[in-house]
Amino acid sequence: MKKVIVSLVILFQVSITNSLTSQNDMPVLKGPYLGRTPPGNRSQIFAPGFVSTQFGELNSVFTADGKEFYFSRRGIPGKPSAIMVTKMINNEWTKPSPVNFSGTYNDVDLFLTPDGKSMIYCSGRIINEGNMARMNNDFWISGRIGDLWGEPTRFAEEAVSEFEDYFPIVTKSGNLYFNSQRGGPGTNDIYCSKFLNGKYTAAEKLPAPINSPFREFDAFVSQDEKMIIFSSERPGGFGGSDIYISFKKSDNSWSEPLNLGNDINSASSEFGATISPDGKYFFYTSGKNGSEDIFWVSAKIIVEISPKEKKYSPIIKSK
């Protein structure tokens, strides 16, 4: 028995030592974009060992001034998924840590409003409804208070459902796009709830060719609602879920989605697409390296893969 106890103590000490060593070995990053050399038209893993680790990282976004970088991290044993932040202070980036409201419940899929004053996200925190309490993935919002974030409150209650809802994004018009499993277990489709007269309407599923009989999710919609980038498990891809792009046509329908190709997509799953506020870089998550990591690539690929859509190039700043 004594040998067992000693062995457990040694294992615990080794675990703590490895954890501390991992923190101490974290690289010091300085300068814009966490000191990374900007990628060209070949995607690269973003900030390995600092942002992208052996755990799962997804849903990344910079603030407009480029001095804060937010993302979700999941897969740490015994801990919920959390929204993380690293900040550039005196030109040096702080070690990523959970934002002040995150770390108790599962929090993922953050969206920062363009002015940086509000964060909308998906959370499994407890919802009290009359005499009942439930935990469900719904949308919550926190307002910025100095360097911190305010108490979470529910967001767009008219649009959400008793099923799982994820990846909220709000456009300039106030319309809310997200994906939901309200079609039943194992399903996933992209929905839109319009913002009319100060309220959100009941969400409606986007028509084909955006949604299909297969799973669609994680839609990044441009602020003018003329471009949508999303993940889909439809046939014809490279495996898992692939990232596609579609543009709004003159008749208000969506163009046939284009697969973003095998530099971005792989035999694994790709999802969580975003574009940096300056329009220069395209970020996404992929499991192509064996764990969920954040990758980035020049946003010029969007114009190059769909040359006839050059009228949308102001969305993408390639210089």
Residue positions per predicted region:
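Bacterial Sec-dependent N-terminal signal peptides
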Residues: 1-25
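Short, conserved micro-motifs composed of acidic
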Residues: 23-319
